[in-house]
Each structure stands twice: as structure tokens, then as C-alpha cells.
Amino acid sequence: MPRPALRSRSLRRIYVKLPSGKTAIHYERKKNDISKCAMCKKPLHGVKTNFLHKYGKSEKRPERPFGGYLCSSCLAQLIKAMVRQ
């Protein structure tokens, strides 16, 4: 039976075949999905995905309006549309 900490389904199970022929289970953290732009769904650049607690606020996302939510091209379109209204 695995330790209580390893029973969590938030850990990914990897079955590894050992030289003896037996299989062992290795546990590792699941990787988060890449963050995407809310308008065009393209991957966002400059946005960290894993282990966010290790980074400061400025390292997690770009420091501009809608940073970490919209890509730069969609933001430019949005600003142009707001100015032209």
C-alpha cells in the first residue's frame, strides 16, 4: 500500500519496468496546461505554468493590461476598437 501522501489522484502514476522484470509505480506531479488567450485561444508567451508558488508576481505573467489573459495581438485589436468608439 502506498504512503497516504502518494494515494492522492493529483499525482500522476508512471509504471516503470525494473531490471528484475517487476513493475514499480513512480509518482510525479501533473503538469498544468499551457495558458491560452481568451479571444484567439493561442498559447500565451511569458506565462509560467508549473510551480507558481516559487515565482514572484511579476514573473508569473506579463505586466501590461490584460497580461496573462490576452495575447499582445488581441490586446492591440481591443485597444484600437476601444479608441475608435
Swiss-Prot record:
Family, per entry: Belongs to the eukaryotic ribosomal protein eL34 family.
Key words of the record: Ribonucleoprotein, Ribosomal protein
Single GO cellular component term: ribosome
One Pfam assignment: Ribosomal_L34e
An annotated Gene Ontology molecular function: structural constituent of ribosome
HAMAP family: Ribosomal_eL34
Coiled-coil portions: none
GO terms (BP aspect): translation
NCBIfam families documented for this protein: PRK04059.1
Protein name (Swiss-Prot/TrEMBL): Large ribosomal subunit protein eL34
